[in-house]
């Protein structure tokens, strides 16, 4: 039951921007999230990958093409915090390629790296189910639940430090299951007492969202996409800047605000067809029409 209660708080958090009484919404989220903790929630995971018949979807995609890469956007956040997860995230592929990757870390907008295969650094967990790495895939991680609790407390003006640290510890433990990299208790303590603590003290909500972004880089990027849209609507900004110059055109946003409808929906549903548009405007709604919980009308 704790799994279903926990996952429901994603949706309640998405709805906060639409809530007439946001504090009441946050209080409900906090009460129910704490109930999930009390009920023993430790993550909703798919622990089924055996390297034979079951291969993690992210790993299967990377393995078939080898052009997914570690991003400088994420790595810069880790380096600035002396993050022990950085070596796991920014793996140079030496043991896989038989030498360090040719192009290294991927900078957003780098067209050569974007078109290259077997040439960039990549997260070690891409070997999940392929090369002796057997780790779960998250439907919802333990760290996400505690980040939700920490965010809600910060928005309510409450002390969020303990829940924030629990969330970060859960993410560090999750990363440490990948490869041979060890993250000791001393490493964890030093990390939480270092630049991370300084940034949290300066702006708790900002650092909660940044650390959630780092944690969900593992395999929860869809929820990160939701957080970007949610926070841009709720706060007017998101603390991690997207720097790919190819995401703008003529000064207009080209980072999708929503996922597109499928062709069968467009063809068979007149309401969807109207939203999709026609001619030169066909499909542009994904860049201009927010989803309803992020301020849109559709």
What spans do the regions from the language model cover?
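Hydrophobic-face positions in mid-chain alpha helices that act as interaction patches
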Residues: 24-146, 155, 161-211, 215, ...
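C-terminal functional modules
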Residues: 172, 188, 192-298
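"A position-specific structural signal for the A-helix of alpha-solenoid helical repeats
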Residues: 3, 7, 11-14, 141-144, ...
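Acidic helix/loop microenvironments that form the catalytic cleft of cell-wall polysaccharide enzymes
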Residues: 2-10, 168-175
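Short, charged low-complexity intrinsically disordered segments located at boundaries
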Residues: 4, 62-68, 179-180, 236-247
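TPR/TPR-like alpha-solenoid repeats
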Residues: 11-12, 18, 152, 215
């Amino acid at each position: 039951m704790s799994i279903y209660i926990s996952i429901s708080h994603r949706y309640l958090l998405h709805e906060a921007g639409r809530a007439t009484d946001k504090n009441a919404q946050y209080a409900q989220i906090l009460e129910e999230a704490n109930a999930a903790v009390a009920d023993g929630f430790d993550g909703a995971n798919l622990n089924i990958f055996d390297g034979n018949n079951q291969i993690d979807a992210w790993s299967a995609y990377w393995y078939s093409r080898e052009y997914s890469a570690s991003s400088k956007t994420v790595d810069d956040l880790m380096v600035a915090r002396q993050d022990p997860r950085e070596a796991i995230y920014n793996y140079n592929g030496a043991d896989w390629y038989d030498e360090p990757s040719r192009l290294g870390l991927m900078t957003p907008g780098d067209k050569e790296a974007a078109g290259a295969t077997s040439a960039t650094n990549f997260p070690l967990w891409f070997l999940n189910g392929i090369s002796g790495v057997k780790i779960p895939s998250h439907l919802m991680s333990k760290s996400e639940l505690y980040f939700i609790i920490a965010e809600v407390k910060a928005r309510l003006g409450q002390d969020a430090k303990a829940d924030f640290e629990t969330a970060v510890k859960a993410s560090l433990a999750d990363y440490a299951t990948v490869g041979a990299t060890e993250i000791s208790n001393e490493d964890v303590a030093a990390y939480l007492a270092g630049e991370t603590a300084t940034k949290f003290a300066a702006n708790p909500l900002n650092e909660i969202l940044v650390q959630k972004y780092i944690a969900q880089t593992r395999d929860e990027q869809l929820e990160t996409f939701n957080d970007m849209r949610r926070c841009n609507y709720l706060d007017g900004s998101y603390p991690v800047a997207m720097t790919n110059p190819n995401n703008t055109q003529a000064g207009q946003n080209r980072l999708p605000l929503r996922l597109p409808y499928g062709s069968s929906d467009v063809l068979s549903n007149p309401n969807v067809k109207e939203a999709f548009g026609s001619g030169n405007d066909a499909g542009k709604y994904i860049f201009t029409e927010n989803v309803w919980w992020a301020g849109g009308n559709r």
